[in-house]
């Protein structure tokens, strides 16, 4: 494909993704184009391939030996040269320590991208599409290695498809490489965090789903029919910005729902939620059949308030998470008087076509003040009303519907419940010595958690939750048994993590269960913390106790109290049905 043809295609797709404005006679707020919200993407310099033969993957890619000048490097063997590239692709900034500090207090600001993790996307033919960080000339060599490895393991057919490569040292897992191969693209994750294979595969699937949401499978197949097609020339600057934000969020652990495969809800009285549902249903009565496919009201930080859906149908959690990510990364600078009309492919719903999203932010008390939200990822995401249609000409109909919904919410005095929702606290639950927990309802595919302190380092806290979750799952992400309980204890003095499994029905026999030891390093000598994972067919519970020696029987009793409390208050904690039409 020629360069000019690629640019014309990109221009065509950009014009298709512009927001639609209506006739001047209709008194609308400003309808904003997504192209005006783009951020600069990394400069795409020509990629330089180097001849490679092999690389010693047993060496830690974060531990880089001191190198001399270019003359000394030119004398290195091909294997040593690629080991140098492997290491320096992760060294755009000084390496971060692997130690887990105290999970209860933040150490500082966001800082640079974590250098202990890397994501790559390349075509099935080995051409680079995206890398999270690292000099392009070094990343190119690493992508070449990944492509060679994948092809080698597929010599005997797809049944031998490579999924992970894990290296170990005396202290356990040193580094892990996870691969996800699709029809047209290959995705690779590299980490030193001892993350489970299933978690990495889930993250790669989210990146792939984003590409599909931006292009659609039909368009991707059509594009890759061209000889020597370079997908980078077709992706927009906002696409690369969104990929950066997705990767960074997965490294920081700021979006727990991506790991759990669930949505977070606000705590709301059942009667208030029912009034919201009634208001949404009344506003849809004037719409023609087929105009509205799905709708939702989302509180700050992407916490679900209610959904508007047809009977027997719903959207996949991944599709909604991609929609929320787009709103977070591209639209947060908009004022509540502005509206957006944007096409988006929902890969889990229908990867071959686009749906059309009407997006409007709800008015808040801060609208009159200076807007401090930036595209760099402010955690306070604005409350939003989203209506989704299969018809690209339905903007005016959905605008009328949205206006009626917002007006009636304001008249009913419900808006403060949405724009400034509160969380329950750990003190609301009779669970002694529990510091924090995450409870997921498998029936509703939603989760809740108590309020945390403003000084909590959420990224570090998520590392503990990730460890707890991996203890209860196998390499494919399935529970070790139908009803599994796993205890974990972090002890800084011994530098070890003790994990014990038991049957949840045997509350008083947990002390006699066999244990296995996993190594991990810690910074604070006073750390002595217990955690629990409890997975059943109906719920998942991940619980962290206060620092100190706590008997497992006490932890189990508190866990049962948490489960009982969440079950009794499910009508407040979760969106059970929503507004069904």
UniProtKB/Swiss-Prot annotation:
One of its GO terms (cellular component) is Mon1-Ccz1 complex. It is a peripheral membrane protein. GO terms for molecular function: guanyl nucleotide exchange factor inhibitor activity; guanyl-nucleotide exchange factor activity; phosphatidylinositol-3-phosphate binding; phosphatidylinositol-5-phosphate binding; phosphatidylserine binding. Keywords: Autophagy, Endosome, Membrane, Protein transport, Transport, Vacuole. InterPro entries: FUZ/MON1/HPS1_longin_1, FUZ/MON1/HPS1_longin_2, FUZ/MON1/HPS1_longin_3, Mon1. The keyword Translocase does not apply. Residues 10-20 have a biased composition (Basic and acidic residues). One of its GO terms (biological process) is late endosome to vacuole transport via multivesicular body sorting pathway. It holds the Pfam family Fuz_longin_3. Belongs to the MON1/SAND family. In complex with CCZ1, is required for multiple vacuole delivery pathways including the cytoplasm to vacuole transport (Cvt), autophagy, pexophagy and endocytosis. The MON1-CCZ1 complex acts at the fusion of vesicles with the vacuole, through its regulation of the SNARE complex during the coordinated priming and docking stages of fusion, and particularly at the stage of tethering/docking. This is Vacuolar fusion protein MON1. It comes from Eremothecium gossypii (strain ATCC 10895 / CBS 109.51 / FGSC 9923 / NRRL Y-1056) (Yeast). The lineage of its organism: Eukaryota, Fungi, Dikarya, Ascomycota, Saccharomycotina.
């Amino acid at each position: 494909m020629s360069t000019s043809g690629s640019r014309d295609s990109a221009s065509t797709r950009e014009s298709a993704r512009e927001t639609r404005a209506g006739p001047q006679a209709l008194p609308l707020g400003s309808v904003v184009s997504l192209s005006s919200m783009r951020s600069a993407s990394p400069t795409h310099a020509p990629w330089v391939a180097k001849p490679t033969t092999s690389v010693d993957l047993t060496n830690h890619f974060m531990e880089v030996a001191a190198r001399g000048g270019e003359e000394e490097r030119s004398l290195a063997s091909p294997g040593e040269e690629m080991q140098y590239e492997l290491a320096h692709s992760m060294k755009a900034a000084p390496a971060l320590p692997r130690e887990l500090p105290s999970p209860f207090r933040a150490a500082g600001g966001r800082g640079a991208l974590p250098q202990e993790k890397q994501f790559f996307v390349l075509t099935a033919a080995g051409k680079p599409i995206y890398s999270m960080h690292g000099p392009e000339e070094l990343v190119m060599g690493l992508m070449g290695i990944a492509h060679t490895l994948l092809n080698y393991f597929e010599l005997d057919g797809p049944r031998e498809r490579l999924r992970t490569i894990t290296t170990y040292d005396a202290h356990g897992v040193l580094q892990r490489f996870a691969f996800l191969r699709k029809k047209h693209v290959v995705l690779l994750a590299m980490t030193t965090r001892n993350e489970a294979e299933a978690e990495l595969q889930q993250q790669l699937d989210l990146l792939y789903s984003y590409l599909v949401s931006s292009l659609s499978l039909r368009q991707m197949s059509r594009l890759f029919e061209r000889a020597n097609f370079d997908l980078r020339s077709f992706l927009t600057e906002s696409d690369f910005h969104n990929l950066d934000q997705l990767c960074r969020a997965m490294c920081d652990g700021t979006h727990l729902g991506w790991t759990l495969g669930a949505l977070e809800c606000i705590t709301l009285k059942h009667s208030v939620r029912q009034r919201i549902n009634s208001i949404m249903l009344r506003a849809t009565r004037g719409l023609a059949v087929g105009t509205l496919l799905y709708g939702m009201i989302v509180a700050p930080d992407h916490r679900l308030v209610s959904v508007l859906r047809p009977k027997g149908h719903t959207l996949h959690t991944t599709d909604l998470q991609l929609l929320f990510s787009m709103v977070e990364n591209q639209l947060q600078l908009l004022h509540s008087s502005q509206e957006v009309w944007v096409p988006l492919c929902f890969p889990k719903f229908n990867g071959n076509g686009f749906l059309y999203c009407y997006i409007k932010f709800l008015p808040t008390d801060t609208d009159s003040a200076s807007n401090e939200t930036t595209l760099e990822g402010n955690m306070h995401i604005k409350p939003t009303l989203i209506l989704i249609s299969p018809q690209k000409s339905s903007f005016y109909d959905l605008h009328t519907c949205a206006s009626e919904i917002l007006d009636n919410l304001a008249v009913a005095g419900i808006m403060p419940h949405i724009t400034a929702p509160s969380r329950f606290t750990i003190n609301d639950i009779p669970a002694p010595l529990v510091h924090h927990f995450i409870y997921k309802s498998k029936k509703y595919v939603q989760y809740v958690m108590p309020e945390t302190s403003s000084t909590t380092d959420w990224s570090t806290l998520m590392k503990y939750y990730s460890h707890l979750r991996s203890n209860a799952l196998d390499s494919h992400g399935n529970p070790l048994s139908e009803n599994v309980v796993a205890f974990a204890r972090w002890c800084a003095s011994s530098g070890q993590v003790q994990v014990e499994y038991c049957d949840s029905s045997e509350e008083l026999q947990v002390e006699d269960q066999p244990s296995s030891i996993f190594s991990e390093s810690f910074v604070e000598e006073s750390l002595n913390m217990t955690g629990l994972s409890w997975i059943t067919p109906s719920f998942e519970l991940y619980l962290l106790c206060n620092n100190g020696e706590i008997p497992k029987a006490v932890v189990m009793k508190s866990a049962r109290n948490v489960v009982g409390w969440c079950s009794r208050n499910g009508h407040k904690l979760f969106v059970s049905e929503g507004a069904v039409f």
